[in-house]
């Protein structure tokens, strides 16, 4: 029929951008490259949000990956290759409205060394205690974006367990770290 158009993107209307409703991924996840200066305080800015979870890796050396989150507190770090979580005031010092601040620790701020950080906004650090699963959890969740930080104490057994994550759907991807020992990271 001559008045019909082919069904393709070229024939579909283009919606006008609405910056008031713009929910692009950059508002919730931003990678950031930076160069250390070795000073006691280095501000990393330009994220356009205050992160709740920051993952830092030195790109010039084999230093450990470090994880920080607003649920546990900024100086509480997790590293993949160490036995337990640690507290270090010279690593991540603060989450800020536009990024974060690091101290002089070599794993996050050696003069002239290059770093990458991956940064997620979740919900501002608000947690809830959940008892619906087989193991009690403390969750910081943004179900709309499908991300949550979960803390729990294992049951000490080898049986399968369930735990609440507040996402509303089965997670597609998990990162798990034993905070008390150098067990396998999953």
Where are the model-predicted features located?
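Surface-exposed molecular-recognition determinants
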Residues: 1-186
